[in-house]
């Protein structure tokens, strides 16, 4: 046998579920409570600092807020929305509760100042009431934290733009002496409420075979016996009367579908059509009648169905006014016509406005003139129906009467303030729009025409059904202890009303109900992209106007502007219910449970005309999580199968599909299926995920140099308490932990040797969980009992190892703490300096079996020699900053051995400093076959432990076989 040695230069590649012989050198079986670093090696994870107790209720939606305030710097908060809809917010750094007030009144950004000093107007927010944690989704943009309830369907407000009265306007356009100015008035029939009475008439009638399918075999009856023309006159059926039509039954002799030998092989194939000659009155769509035995042939039956109806109105003359001008004074002409109307036309009132006449009535009417060159008339037209309140708590339907002109040139220069006109332009509805006259200073006469929304329709969004906001107000107050306390306002948002067009020319976004419906599609999530708010609902993506976040309607019905709202839909052959998204360089990545899409534009400006959506992936997505930014790439979890997977989407561009890599392949069956809570940090190249109410956090550490990934490691942390929310903000990891029906806030600083988290003056961190400090003046020494007592600054967990660490002249002194109630006791005198108290946690690394490895051929892949015989003599472990740690050797057929490595001995470090070795090589004797033992390295001590590398020595033979 040959004596050989081999070195694994680093152990930062994390856990692998592969067989040991396939593991890449540097991977391990288990890596618990570690933190890989490409520079510093495999570190013991940082301890967690106890911040404060938060609440006794863990249920609800938890979230965090991070914003940069130019006056106070980085502001960090954690919040909870209870199941009942109450909002609680704490400062992440201090744990102090912040002031939260409520408003039931929808607000806009311009109105925030009115609420700075407001008190509570409510104790709960109904929109926030929820049953499932993922029912509420949160998005923070500057001072606004938007909250979306996935179970609430958006709706329109019952408030409508007030319909105009029955009115008309006559503008004098020419003065012609000795020519009559004639106006004819007609009243349109209406009911007692003033609604236009409309009579329906059939405009579409269909016919079908009834009780047979148009095919008759010659065995059953004579060929084409049912053909003919059949007339129906003055027929009453359904809800109408007096319809006339005739039907034409045609026949063709064909070869039978079921020939028999008994008779001649012939059959009759019939077709039928209907021609409407009189639509009658009173019919409704769907009315039908069956006519039987046409032509005296039994079974020759047909069903006639009304498919469409039209409506007519009845007019009655109210009279005529006429003025034969013998003057060239327009004022005289107008005054004379106004006087004639008021004196002779019953129920109609007229007034002179500038160069025209404003006419109104309590009942619908029309006005016309035989000579349009003298006067231009803007008269009322029927513009459909609208729904309004009836004054008794209900609703009623009204006729929407709106004046109309064919083109903008017919609009008068002077008019009634507030007068609304529909400009038709052509026979197409798509180019119609509405304008409103705005008189100077709100007065009749001179003014301008401005585009407006169609009156009588729902143009206002119901704020109570839309996402609400938790708003960080500008004012900050101080509590009795001098701590800054922020003010937050919980309120619905005031969404801008539709200011132009109607349901066709300026439609609602997809998440709002279609016209005639009550409820829309629930908003699944909100995003922020290209200075727009983004709403995901079913397969639809809707965006606000650019920079005007609470405006979801277009600016004009005349043209599409670049900053108008965007409404688009993804296209897929499988259900694509969108759940979340992430901004990437190429656009906006949106994800559904089974597919990924890219919303983008090929133009510099994202607009309704330039938006494009492409399908770029078909991978399963865990909808309880969110897509994550990995620098230029995107990562996301999948929960298909028994275990979770983590995919990375690489090179997302507009001209080709991205490459998707499963980064969790090495972890195999390690990741739990129900991962739900995800925290990530691009600065620290770290992703942390866990199940809700679990104390185990799965971590993925990555690092790239150029296009090469040099670090891709999975490892796990175990914490005291179950995680209900966690987040990484800059270099700090925050976790809300539930233990014993108490939610507590802790923080771990991820950056090694960061001054803010360095507890000893030697730049070594103390690795306690839930650590807290006690000042020397708060320590009491009892000389008789030789005990030091103090009030515990942290929670007490009976099952955990509680210790103290001295920071004074005896730096590094460690003692066990006994607790009685809230009083902690240490043996000896500890009053010379401050102390840190906390709970030990165990760092554990389980090494894989050792095999001789070599690079294979030109491919350079690592290949393990599992056929040869290897007896390992010893293992030399190289460590960095390390104090107390243990090596546990489990051997087949032998007792387990635990080798303890103490801190450096006296004489090897400076007095009154922490006895921690900066670098050391420790030998672990093995003397066993490589497949017969397992080695673990652990540290359950407040001192650091850093693993650099491992080198094994042993005797090896290839058993005289050569690999080929």
Q: What kind of feature is each model-predicted range?
A:
Residues 198-323, 339:
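Conserved, function-critical positions that sit in or immediately flank catalytic
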Residues 57-60, 111-136, 495-524, 569-580, ...:
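Short linear interaction motifs
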Residues 113-180, 188-190, 355-359, 363-369:
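Hydrophobic or amphipathic alpha-helical targeting/insertion segments
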Residues 49-58, 493-531, 536-685, 690-728, ...:
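Beta-propeller and closely related beta-pinwheel folds
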Residues 62, 329-345:
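Amphipathic, non-transmembrane alpha-helical segments in extracytoplasmic/periplasmic proteins
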Residues 1-95, 189-191, 394-525, 529-577, ...:
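N-terminal beta-propeller domains
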């Amino acid at each position: 046998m040959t004596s050989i040695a081999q070195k694994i230069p680093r152990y930062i590649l994390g856990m692998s579920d592969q067989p040991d012989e396939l593991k890449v050198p540097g991977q391990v079986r288990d890596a618990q409570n570690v933190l890989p670093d490409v520079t510093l090696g495999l570190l013991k994870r940082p301890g967690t600092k106890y911040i404060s107790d938060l609440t006794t209720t863990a249920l609800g939606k938890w979230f965090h807020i991070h914003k940069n305030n130019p006056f106070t710097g980085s502001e960090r908060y954690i919040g909870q929305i209870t199941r009942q809809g109450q909002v609680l917010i704490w400062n992440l750094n201090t744990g102090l509760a912040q002031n939260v007030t409520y408003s039931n009144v929808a607000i806009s950004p311009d109105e925030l100042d009115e609420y700075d000093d407001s008190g509570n107007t409510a104790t709960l927010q109904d929109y926030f009431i929820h049953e499932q944690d993922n029912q509420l989704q949160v998005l923070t943009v500057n001072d606004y934290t938007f909250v979306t309830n996935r179970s609430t369907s958006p709706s329109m407000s019952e408030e409508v733009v007030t319909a105009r009265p029955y009115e008309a306007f006559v503008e004098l356009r020419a003065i012609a002496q000795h020519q009559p100015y004639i106006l004819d008035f007609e009243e349109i029939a209406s009911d007692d409420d003033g609604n236009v009475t409309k009579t329906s008439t059939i405009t579409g009638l269909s016919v079908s075979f009834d009780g047979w399918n148009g095919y008759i075999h010659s065995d059953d009856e004579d060929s084409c016996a049912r053909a003919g023309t059949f007339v129906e006159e003055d027929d009453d059926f359904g809800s109408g009367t007096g319809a006339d039509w005739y039907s034409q039954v045609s026949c063709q002799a064909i070869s039978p579908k079921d020939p028999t030998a008994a008779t001649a092989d012939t059959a009759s194939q019939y077709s039928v059509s209907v021609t409407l000659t009189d639509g009658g009155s009173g019919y409704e769509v769907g009315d039908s009648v069956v006519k039987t035995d046409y032509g005296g042939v039994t079974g020759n039956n047909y069903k006639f169905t009304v498919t469409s109806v039209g409506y007519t109105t009845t007019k009655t003359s109210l009279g005529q006014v006429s003025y034969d001008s013998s003057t060239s004074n327009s004022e005289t002409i107008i005054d004379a016509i106004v006087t004639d109307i008021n004196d002779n036309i019953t129920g109609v009132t007229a007034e002179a406005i500038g160069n025209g006449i404003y006419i109104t009535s309590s009942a619908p009417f029309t006005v016309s003139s035989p000579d349009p060159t003298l006067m231009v008339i803007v008269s009322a037209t029927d513009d459909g129906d609208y729904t309004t309140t009836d004054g008794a708590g209900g609703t009623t339907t009204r006729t929407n009467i709106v004046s109309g002109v064919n083109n903008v040139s017919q609009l008068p220069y002077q008019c009634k303030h507030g007068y609304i006109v529909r400009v038709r332009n052509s026979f197409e509805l798509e180019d119609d729009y509405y304008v409103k006259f705005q008189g100077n200073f709100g007065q009749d006469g001179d003014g301008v025409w401005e585009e407006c929304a169609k009156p009588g329709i729902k143009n206002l969004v119901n704020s109570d059904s839309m996402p609400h906001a938790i708003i960080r107000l500008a004012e900050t107050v101080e509590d009795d202890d001098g701590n800054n306390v922020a003010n937050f306002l919980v309120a619905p948002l005031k969404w801008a009303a539709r200011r132009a067009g109607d349901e066709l020319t300026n439609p609602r976004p997809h998440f709002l109900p279609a016209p005639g419906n009550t409820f829309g599609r629930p908003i699944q999530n909100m995003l922020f992209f290209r200075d727009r708010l983004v709403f995901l609902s079913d397969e639809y993506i809707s965006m606000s106007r650019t920079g005007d976040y609470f405006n979801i309607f277009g600016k004009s019905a005349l043209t599409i502007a670049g900053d108008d709202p965007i409404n688009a839909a993804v296209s897929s052959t499988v259900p694509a219910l969108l759940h979340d998204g992430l901004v990437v360089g190429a656009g906006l990545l949106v994800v559904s449970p089974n597919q990924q899409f890219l919303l983008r534009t090929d133009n510099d400006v994202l607009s309704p005309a330039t938006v494009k959506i492409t399908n770029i992936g078909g991978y399963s997505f865990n909808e309880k999580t969110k897509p994550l930014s990995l620098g230029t790439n995107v990562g996301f979890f999948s929960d298909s199968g028994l275990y979770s997977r983590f995919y990375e989407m690489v090179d997302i561009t507009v001209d080709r599909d991205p490459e998707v890599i499963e980064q969790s392949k090495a972890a195999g069956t390690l990741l739990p299926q129900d991962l739900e809570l995800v925290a990530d940090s691009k600065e620290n190249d770290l992703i942390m995920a866990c199940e809700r109410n679990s104390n185990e956090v799965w971590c993925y550490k990555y690092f790239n140099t150029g296009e090469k990934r040099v670090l891709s490691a999975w490892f796990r942390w175990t914490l005291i308490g179950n995680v209900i929310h966690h987040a990484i903000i800059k270099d700090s990891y925050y976790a809300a932990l539930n233990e014993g029906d108490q939610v507590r806030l802790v923080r771990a600083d991820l950056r090694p040797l960061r001054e803010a988290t360095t507890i000893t003056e030697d730049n070594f961190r103390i690795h306690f969980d839930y650590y807290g400090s006690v000042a020397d003046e708060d320590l009491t020494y009892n000389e008789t009992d030789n005990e030091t007592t103090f009030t515990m600054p942290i929670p007490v967990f009976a099952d955990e190892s509680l210790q103290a660490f001295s920071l004074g002249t005896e730096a590094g002194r460690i003692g066990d703490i006994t607790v009685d109630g809230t009083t902690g006791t240490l043996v000896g005198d500890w009053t010379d300096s401050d102390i840190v108290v906390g709970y030990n946690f165990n760092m554990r690394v389980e090494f894989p079996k050792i095999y001789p490895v070599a690079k294979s051929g030109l491919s350079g892949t690592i290949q393990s020699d599992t056929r040869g015989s290897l007896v390992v003599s010893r293992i030399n472990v190289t460590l960095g900053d390390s104090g107390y740690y243990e090596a546990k050797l489990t051997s087949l057929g032998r007792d387990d051995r635990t080798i303890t490595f103490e801190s450096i001995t006296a004489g090897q470090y400076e007095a009154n400093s922490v006895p921690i070795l900066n670098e050391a090589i420790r030998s672990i004797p093995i003397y066993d076959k490589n497949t017969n033992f397992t080695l673990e390295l652990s540290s359950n001590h407040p001192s650091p432990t850093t693993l650099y590398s491992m080198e094994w020595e042993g005797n090896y033979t290839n058993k005289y076989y050569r690999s080929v």
